[in-house]
C-alpha cells in the first residue's frame, strides 16, 4: 500500500468517527428558542407531533461506547492504513501460531504414517480414519463424499486411472496437480468429420453405431491416435483416456461425446503440496489407493 492510500484510509476512517460524534452532540437536544409553546419542535405530520425529548441515556451510553470501542480497536489492531496496531497482531501470524500448535500435537502421528509404504498404510484402520477426515475437508467437494466423482471429476473407487493408479503416481498427482486438455475438433474436422470419429470411438467400446460412419471415422482417427494411441487405449503419460472401456469422465452418451470432441475439454486438479505437506500427501495417496483395493 502506498503512503497516499494509507493516509487516505486513515483520514477517512477517523473523519467518519469524528462526524458521527459531532452529529450525536448536535442532535442530542434542540435549542429551546426553537421550541413551540406546547413543548414540541413544531414539526407535525398527519396529526403526529414531534416532541423535543432528550435521547435515552442508555442509548447515548451505548453510542459513545461504540465510538470508544472503534478508537480502541484502531489503536490496537490493523485498520488505519499501514499502521499495524499497538499489539502487532496479524491474521497471518495467528495462522502460523495455530499451524505450529497443530504440527506439535499431530506431527509425530503423521511422521509414523509417512514411514509406512502406501500399500501397507492403506490397510491401517486408524490411518484411514484420519485420512477420511482429510478427504472430506479437501477432496469431497469435487470427488464426492463417497469418492465416486461426477461429470468432470474422476471416480476414485474403480481401477480406471488417467495418470496411473500406482502409489508413486498418486503421490505425484496430489503433489503437483494435473492439467488435462482435450482440443476442440469442430473447426478442423467439421461437423460431419467429428460425427464419424465419434462413431468410431464409440465402436471401440463395443457400442452399436452406424457402420459407415464408424468406417469413415477410422480413417480420420489418426489425428486422435497421437494422444489416445492407435488402438484407442489411451496414454497415462499424457492423461489421455482409454476409449475402449465404458468409463467416460464427462459422460458416454453420444451427445456428450460429440460435445467433447466438438468443443474440447479443460480440466484441472489442484496441487496439495503446500496445503497438506508431504506427510499428509503420503497419507492421502494411501487413502485413495485403498478405495480401489478393497
Task: Provide a role label for each language-model segment.
Residues 34-37, 117, 142, 156, ...:
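Residues at structural and domain junctions
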Residues 123-148, 158, 164, 171-176, ...:
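Sequence/structural segment immediately N-terminal to covalent heme-attachment motifs in c-type
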Residues 46, 52, 155-158, 167, ...:
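Acidic side chains
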Residues 150, 154-157, 175-194, 201-212, ...:
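Axial heme c-ligation environment in periplasmic c-type cytochrome domains
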Residues 2-122, 163-169, 184-201, 276-288:
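Periplasmic c-type cytochrome electron-transfer domains
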Amino acid at each position: 500500500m502506498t503512503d497516499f492510500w494509507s493516509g487516505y484510509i486513515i483520514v477517512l476512517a477517523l473523519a467518519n468517527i469524528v462526524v458521527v460524534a459531532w452529529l450525536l452532540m448536535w442532535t442530542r437536544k434542540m435549542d429551546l428558542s426553537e421550541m413551540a409553546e406546547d413543548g414540541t419542535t413544531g414539526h407535525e405530520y398527519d396529526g403526529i407531533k414531534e416532541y423535543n425529548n432528550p435521547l435515552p441515556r442508555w442509548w447515548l451510553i451505548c453510542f459513545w461506547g461504540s465510538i470508544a470501542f472503534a478508537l480502541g480497536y484502531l489503536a490496537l489492531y490493523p485498520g488505519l492504513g499501514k499502521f499495524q496496531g499497538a499489539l502487532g497482531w496479524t491474521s497471518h501470524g495467528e495462522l502460523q501460531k495455530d499451524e505450529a500448535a497443530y504440527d506439535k500435537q499431530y506431527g509425530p502421528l503423521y511422521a509414523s504414517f509417512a514411514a509406512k509404504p502406501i500399500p501397507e498404510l492403506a490397510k491401517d484402520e486408524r490411518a484411514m480414519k484420519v485420512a477420511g477426515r482429510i478427504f472430506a475437508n479437501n477432496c469431497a467437494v469435487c470427488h464426492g463424499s463417497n469418492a465416486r466423482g461426477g461429470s468432470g471429476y474422476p471416480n476414485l473407487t474403480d481401477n480406471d486411472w488417467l495418470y496411473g493408479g500406482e502409489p508413486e503416481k498418486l503421490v505425484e498427482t496430489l503433489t503437483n496437480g494435473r492439467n488435462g486438455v482435450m482440443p476442440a475438433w469442430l473447426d478442423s474436422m467439421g461437423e460431419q468429420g467429428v460425427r464419424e470419429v465419434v462413431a468410431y470411438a464409440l465402436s471401440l467400446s463395443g457400442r452399436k453405431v452406424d457402420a459407415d460412419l464408424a468406417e469413415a471415422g477410422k480413417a480420420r482417427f489418426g489425428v486422435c491416435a497421437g494422444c489416445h494411441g492407435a488402438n484407442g487405449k489411451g496414454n497415462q503419460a499424457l492423461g489421455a483416456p482409454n476409449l475402449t472401456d465404458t468409463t467416460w469422465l464427462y459422460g458416454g452418451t453420444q451427445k456428450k461425446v460429440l460435445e467433447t470432441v466438438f468443443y474440447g475439454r479443460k480440466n484441472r486438479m489442484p496441487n496439495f503440496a503446500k496445503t497438506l505437506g508431504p506427510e499428509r500427501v503420503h497419507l492421502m495417496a494411501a487413502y485413495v489407493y485403498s478405495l480401489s483395493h478393497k
